[in-house]
Amino acid sequence: MKAETTTGVEELLNELVGRAAGEVGLILFSLGIEGEFTDDQLSLELGIEINEIRKALFALYEIGLADYVRRRDDETGWMEYYWRINYDKALDVLKRELEKTAKKLREKIEAETSTIYYICPNMCVKVSYNDAMELNFTCPRCGAMLDYLDCSKAIEKIEEEVRRIEEILESLDKNSG
């Protein structure tokens, strides 16, 4: 799967993995490991603390890019985790995360367009019109008069981001279908 992806998709996947699992997660994902492995093996081979490896693997698991099975070690009796990176699910995970982001952005647009906001000129607070009325249009922290906040530019930027995500999703659907 890794060889077939475009540079843009790889960049998006790397951004997603980095955000979810940090630098160690990005290292693990970029290794292209086939088959099962243990966190102990990776820790020894990569020289990275086992707790960092585990943290990254569980973060990858949380977003669906890794799976594990637990097996008892016959010699020690301890439970061991055998991990697998789900490269074959990467595009689906990326699509799902992009769709979640677009949904959150649409909700933000809805909130910004359905509410009138006022802001302190000293950037202490941002409050709704109703809250501003209760405060007599005075900042509760510094006492400055609250100013009307024009959210139109912010809304435009959010809408632009939603369009960009929708274009990416459309492109992913065309390339994977």
Curated annotation (Swiss-Prot):
Single GO biological process annotation from the record: regulation of DNA-templated transcription
Domain spans labelled HTH TFE/IIEalpha-type: 9-91
The keyword Cytoplasm is annotated on this UniProt entry: no
PROSITE patterns in the record: HTH_TFE_IIE
Record-annotated membrane-spanning stretches: none
Keywords linked to the UniProt accession: DNA-binding, Transcription, Transcription regulation
GO molecular function ontology, one term from the record: DNA binding
UniProt keyword Disulfide bond present: no
Pfam families the record matches: TFIIE_alpha, Zn_Ribbon_TF
PANTHER family, sorted: GENERAL TRANSCRIPTION FACTOR IIE SUBUNIT 1, TRANSCRIPTION INITIATION FACTOR IIE, ALPHA SUBUNIT
Family from the record: Belongs to the TFE family.
Complexes and interactors: Monomer. Interaction with RNA polymerase subunits RpoF and RpoE is necessary for Tfe stimulatory transcription activity. Able to interact with Tbp and RNA polymerase in the absence of DNA promoter. Interacts both with the preinitiation and elongation complexes.
Main function: Transcription factor that plays a role in the activation of archaeal genes transcribed by RNA polymerase. Facilitates transcription initiation by enhancing TATA-box recognition by TATA-box-binding protein (Tbp), and transcription factor B (Tfb) and RNA polymerase recruitment. Not absolutely required for transcription in vitro, but particularly important in cases where Tbp or Tfb function is not optimal. It dynamically alters the nucleic acid-binding properties of RNA polymerases by stabilizing the initiation complex and destabilizing elongation complexes.
Domain description: The winged helix domain is involved in binding to DNA in the preinitiation complex.
NCBIfam families given in the database record: transcription factor E
Protein name listed in UniProt: Transcription factor E
